[in-house]
Amino acid sequence: MNLDFSQCFGDKGDIENITEADIISTVEFDHTGDFLATGDKGGRVVLFERNQSKKKQSCEYKFFTEFQSHDAEFDYLKSLEIEEKINKIKWLKSANDSLCLLSTNDKTIKLWKIQERQIKLVSENNLNGLNHLPSSNIGIESLKLPQLQLHDKLISAQPKKIYANAHAYHINSISVNSDQETYLSADDLRINLWNLGIADQSFNIVDIKPANMEELTEVITSAEFHPLQCNLFMYSSSKGTIKLSDMRSNSLCDSHAKIFEEYLDPSSHNFFTEITSSISDVKFSHDGRYIASRDYMTVKIWDLAMENKPIKTIDVHEHLRERLCDTYENDAIFDKFEVQFGGDNKSVMTGSYNNQFVIYPNAVNTGNDDKPKFKSAFKNSSKRSKKNGFSTRTTDDDDDDDDDDDDEEADDEFDEEVPATKNSPGSQLEDDDEQEEIILQADKSAFKSKKSGQHPMRRRMTSGVGSNLGREFDDVDFKKSILHLSWHPRENSVAIAATNNLYIFSTL
């Protein structure tokens, strides 16, 4: 996979001059990939649409609309200020030309309907201008029939439903069910089930609040519905466990159907492992077979058929293990990184520091076949040369025309199967701990790479000790963290939130 920098939205100023309200707090592609939504700490939602005027084999977006989703409020009963920050955005599938999405801050969820309306005005009449009186020289021959002509297009965003007063604690997750009729919302101690058409009633399906709050040992950190089976959902905890529940078993799903938990040697426990083991995000693969979980140090891939241990553990922040004291002092250890599955259901993506994000191709590798094959989900837009046991891009501008012709022959990015060789990224690795990683940077260096024609990404194999991410840097800038990202559902394009900027990288 060769990802190229495509475009960037937002002010390119220094990080010290950034307004807090402009920092992006969530980013999400819709189900088609034609629209992209971002939410920020100022309570605003900004929508981008695919630029259809560009050539077919490109991934560029343009501004569509912006609206204020949430405002700061004050809870007078608890004497608490409720921030306007957008925690999550989730798209609904639309049956017509309108767009629908859910947005939430710490307490209130809103269902928005975005429509593009055409404004028509009367273009001809029989009045004499400002006096609005019939013209004095009017005759039968000069009478004009009123005509409506298109004057302008107006994009309106209206809150159709407001789901409030159901959470006593901060909402960290919302997830739309595959039936497109219900969704769940999760806070620190409870998960509620909503019907999209009913705003004043929800059902509590998980409640881990103890009778005595002094006995509280864990909180809910993330929750998501299964992408195909509407009765299944999962939620993660600060103890590093993932629980899969079936709503058919009981109205209150406190008894989980499965629990995904890895045994850890008690002798290795310390003050920091209690914090770093907390799961910040969980995602189902698109086919519902696998789960990707992200904690501060690792990404873990779980098979739904195996609960006792993950099928792969990727050490993302191994280079920070000796610096956990520093991360604790500056609160970086509490950063909540997201994780995303690619459209091939095998590759995963997550963020790190220094404005870096990492893609792990074929992180899910079943190796069932004698001659393993991998789906070419990541088509190349340039020639490759073999170097150091894996493929690297050769920057040759003369090949661009040939590459465009090759791209047009492909009907579906996820259909072509390529035989895997020993050194190819899709082959079954001899060492289970080995994993290819692709590192990219979402900052000004992306502009320089695009201008110079150099490829912005670095590719390497990690073995045993995990990721080498950040080893080249003496200093880690903890202020430049990539927490929020989204993967295009049908293409090899990703959207990255870097403080107040939105970066688009694509293979197209």
Curated annotation (Swiss-Prot):
Pfam families: WD40 (PF00400). Residues 369-466 are annotated as: Disordered. One of its GO terms (biological process) is negative regulation of G2/M transition of mitotic cell cycle. WD repeats lie at residues 19-58, 81-122, 166-204, 215-255, 274-312, 329-370, 477-507. Keywords: Cell cycle, Repeat, WD repeat. Belongs to the phosphatase 2A regulatory subunit B family. PP2A exists in several trimeric forms, all of which consist of a core composed of a catalytic subunit associated with a 65 kDa (PR65) (Subunit A) and a 55 kDa (PR55) (Subunit B) regulatory subunit. This is Protein phosphatase PP2A regulatory subunit B. It comes from Candida tropicalis. The lineage of its organism: Eukaryota, Fungi, Dikarya, Ascomycota, Saccharomycotina. The gene is CDC55.
